[in-house]
């Protein structure tokens, strides 16, 4: 029933993915060997969304792991849940992409992509009714960004009617790992705009801020950051895996969140986030969750929702709570902050309630918002891209692998178009929308 196939690519994607499977295993009561050791039938009822049951009663994740170098794969394999994955589903090259997206998209990645697609096909054939794919990758490196988007476009050709959800780690504004991040990110966004259905935007700096400010961690590690991401990932699909009062799936999510097909880049947030020290001083209530969930400091990407307006948003609550209270709180948010929502989409906040809370919590909520302020993120990457591209800096690394300068120009203009589309809908008012329609009708009559 409604399976989701999980794909992780590159170093970042594999590290997030490894953490994600730890979280999902804990929720379904599955131990590191793939055996079930939980205490509730609900954990097994829809375990097949993310797991395949093998003949000996082991649960095997529906996951495909790919990378262009064996390093990260080895660390996943030797990690706590390394033996749960099917050994054939590790697909890796030897040379690495070296942060060069031309290698990941055209040379090294293109050689490996067929074997990845074979594994994806095998997994998809095992599914009863495949709902879609979720891809974890970063956009700054070479493998996750370029080979990830190459795989997405290939899967798009083969499974055009299945949902494609991505968790994409964008380059951070101040923290940068590599100098060519703006190139790789722009080339990837160019692909994601066309081929992905829903794109959850994350970035390390915002996650670090949450760890410092909210969780009061003095030295956050990537493990802590990935834990935040995996809590959100698990929240997005909880309705598929556990019974709830108001269910949603990937397609319902897309229909409720995407007013225009190109604008499918979402901000995500998670509540409750509290530091270990102050946990016992906080009551977990629906108002408290709602307040924290809509807080700008809680967003996992470096864009401030107060600088733009929400086109749509979706809140997924988990735990035993009254739906009436959830609806009241959501209405309350919309009424108090009406200037932050566009007025030409009525009822633009969807809420979902799932009865089973995450492991170790009484209640939790996941937030997904389609806000025009995400353009800050694209604009920032675009400025960095232009600064380097104007001088053709580092370009020989890409053209040497067979890329053309025109591709860069195309990707740049696509990114700039995206920014101006977000800006256009941020400025639009209800009256203008009416005028557009009148003009269009006038044109038709002519």
UniProtKB/Swiss-Prot annotation:
Record localization: Cytoplasm, Cytoskeleton
Signal peptide: none
Chain's gene name: TUBB1
Tissue expression pattern: Found in areas of rapidly dividing tissues.
Biased composition (Acidic residues): 429-446
Quaternary data: Dimer of alpha and beta chains. A typical microtubule is a hollow water-filled tube with an outer diameter of 25 nm and an inner diameter of 15 nM. Alpha-beta heterodimers associate head-to-tail to form protofilaments running lengthwise along the microtubule wall with the beta-tubulin subunit facing the microtubule plus end conferring a structural polarity. Microtubules usually have 13 protofilaments but different protofilament numbers can be found in some organisms and specialized cells.
GO cellular component: a single term: microtubule
Gene Ontology biological process terms from the UniProt entry: microtubule cytoskeleton organization; mitotic cell cycle
Positions bound to GTP: 11, 69, 138, 142-144, 204, 226
Protein name listed in UniProt: Tubulin beta-1 chain
Binding site for Mg(2+): 69
Protein role: Tubulin is the major constituent of microtubules, a cylinder consisting of laterally associated linear protofilaments composed of alpha- and beta-tubulin heterodimers. Microtubules grow by the addition of GTP-tubulin dimers to the microtubule end, where a stabilizing cap forms. Below the cap, tubulin dimers are in GDP-bound state, owing to GTPase activity of alpha-tubulin.
Family: Belongs to the tubulin family.
Required cofactor names: Mg(2+)
Source domain of life: Eukaryota
Originating species: Zea mays
